[in-house]
């Protein structure tokens, strides 16, 4: 599995960059925000999410881990694919998007190409508990994704994550949360 690429940017378009890594050129799907921060001929380091579908093998690239985490979470929402998730990341930074969800600004979410009222409402409902407002956010968000992938619901996960000690590692947070979820 590819989790990162370091190489020279060969080509930049609105939603894709080509990166040459030791003689191999990779096509990587990126948000317009990410594409605007890269320069042709310059070295780039992207965090990669590899998605393998029946008809395609796709690489999605991110400059920041927070973008990658948000993208992965968006893909779990029924009706949101890579194109819409990239459109969201093209329109808002992860912090801006978090504020939109926290303040329930459905209308702003509907301004993203491909998102109508029904999908905006679904995204809002699915993500309302995902963002935790404190300094332990990265650890809690990663633990949330891991627990969700194990089949737990956000209504079960969030109350437990909020009670955990703030200085835990991701692994410790998952372990403690699992103990509480299974008891």
Swiss-Prot record:
InterPro entries in UniProt: DNA_helicase_Holl-junc_RuvA_I (IPR013849), Hlx-hairpin-Hlx_DNA-bd_motif (IPR003583), NA-bd_OB-fold (IPR012340), RuvA (IPR000085), RuvA_2-like (IPR010994), RuvA_C (IPR011114), RuvA_C_sf (IPR036267)
Domain of life: Bacteria
Residues covered by region (Flexible linker): 141
Alphabetized Gene3D superfamilies for the sequence: 5' to 3' exonuclease, C-terminal subdomain, DNA helicase RuvA subunit, C-terminal domain, Nucleic acid-binding proteins
Region annotation Domain II: where it falls in the sequence: 64-141
Main localization category: cytoplasm
One example of a Gene Ontology biological process annotation: DNA repair
Location of the region described as Domain III in the Swiss-Prot/TrEMBL record: 141-183
Keywords: Cytoplasm, DNA damage, DNA recombination, DNA repair, DNA-binding
GO CC annotation terms, alphabetical: cytoplasm; Holliday junction helicase complex; Holliday junction resolvase complex
Ranges for region Domain I: 1-63
Subunit text: Homotetramer. Forms an RuvA(8)-RuvB(12)-Holliday junction (HJ) complex. HJ DNA is sandwiched between 2 RuvA tetramers; dsDNA enters through RuvA and exits via RuvB. An RuvB hexamer assembles on each DNA strand where it exits the tetramer. Each RuvB hexamer is contacted by two RuvA subunits (via domain III) on 2 adjacent RuvB subunits; this complex drives branch migration. In the full resolvosome a probable DNA-RuvA(4)-RuvB(12)-RuvC(2) complex forms which resolves the HJ.
Homology family: Belongs to the RuvA family.
Name of protein: Holliday junction branch migration complex subunit RuvA
Organism this protein belongs to: Helicobacter acinonychis (strain Sheeba)
Lineage: Bacteria, Pseudomonadati, Campylobacterota, Epsilonproteobacteria, Campylobacterales
Record gene name: ruvA
């Amino acid at each position: 599995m590819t989790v990162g690429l370091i190489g020279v940017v060969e080509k930049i378009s609105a939603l894709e960059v080509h990166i040459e890594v030791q003689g191999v050129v990779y096509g990587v799907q990126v948000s317009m925000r990410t594409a605007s921060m890269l320069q042709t001929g310059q070295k780039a380091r992207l965090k990669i999410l590899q998605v393998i579908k029946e008809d395609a093998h796709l690489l999605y690239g991110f400059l920041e881990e927070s973008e990658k985490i948000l993208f992965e979470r968006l893909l779990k929402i029924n009706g949101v694919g890579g194109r819409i998730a990239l459109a969201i990341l093209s329109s808002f930074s992860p912090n801006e998007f978090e504020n939109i969800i926290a303040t329930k600004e459905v209308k702003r979410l509907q301004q993203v190409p491909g998102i109508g009222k029904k999908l905006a409402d679904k995204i809002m409902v699915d993500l309302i508990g995902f963002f935790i407002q404190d300094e332990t956010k990265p650890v809690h968000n990663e633990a949330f994704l891991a627990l969700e992938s194990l089949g737990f619901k956000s209504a079960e996960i969030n109350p437990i994550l909020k009670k955990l000690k703030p200085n835990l590692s991701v692994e410790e947070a998952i372990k403690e949360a699992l103990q509480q979820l299974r008891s």
